[in-house]
Amino acid sequence: MEQGIEIKLRPLTVNDADFMVALASNPDAAKYLPAMITDRQMMKDWIKGLEPKEHEYIVLLDDTKIGECSLVVSTDHSAEIGFILFPEYWGRGCGTAVVRQLLEKARQMSIGELTAKTNVNNTAAIQLLTKFDFQKQYIGWILALADDGNELSGSQTIAQFKKTM
C-alpha cells in the first residue's frame, strides 16, 4: 500500500444504499462513469439483485466510507475491476491501495486475466491502470440506455485495459 494509506474493503450491503446514492450523485465522482443509479430504492434493488460472481465492496479509510469498488468474475477465469472514490480522496494513494487489494482478491480467486474500463478523459485512472501493468486494448463507446431503450446522458467514449495475472 501507499505509505500511510491503509484502506479496507468490505462487502457491499443493502444498508449502504444511501452512501452509494450519495457517491453516484456526486458530480465530480461520477463524471467519468456511465449513468449511475441515484434513486435510493433502485439502488437497494440493484444491491439485492447482485449475483454471486459480482463482488462489490465498500472502500473504507479509517472506518470512513470513501468509495466503492468491484471485481466481477466471468466464467472463463477472467474478471473486470472498477472503482469510484469521493474526489477528496483522489491523489492520496487511495486508488492505488484499492487496485492492489482487488489484484490480491483476483489472485486468491485464481483469476487469470483482468480487464478495466475507464473514460478516455480520466487520465488519473489510465495512469493508475498503467502503473499496474494493464495494457490498453481498445477505445470504444458505452451507450447508456434507459429501461425504455432511450439513450441516457451517461453515454461516453471509454478505453478498455487488460492485465494477465
Positions of the model-derived regions?
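Acyl-donor (CoA/ACP) binding surface of acyl/acetyltransferases
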Residues: 1-18, 23, 59-165
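Generic structural signal for secondary-structure transition and capping sites
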Residues: 17, 28-29, 52-56, 111
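Helix-loop element at the rim of GNAT/NAT acetyltransferase active sites that forms part
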Residues: 22-36
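Residue-level signal for alpha-helix termini/capping positions
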Residues: 25, 48-51, 107-108
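Active-site rim helix/loop that mediates acceptor-substrate recognition in acyltransferases
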Residues: 36-55
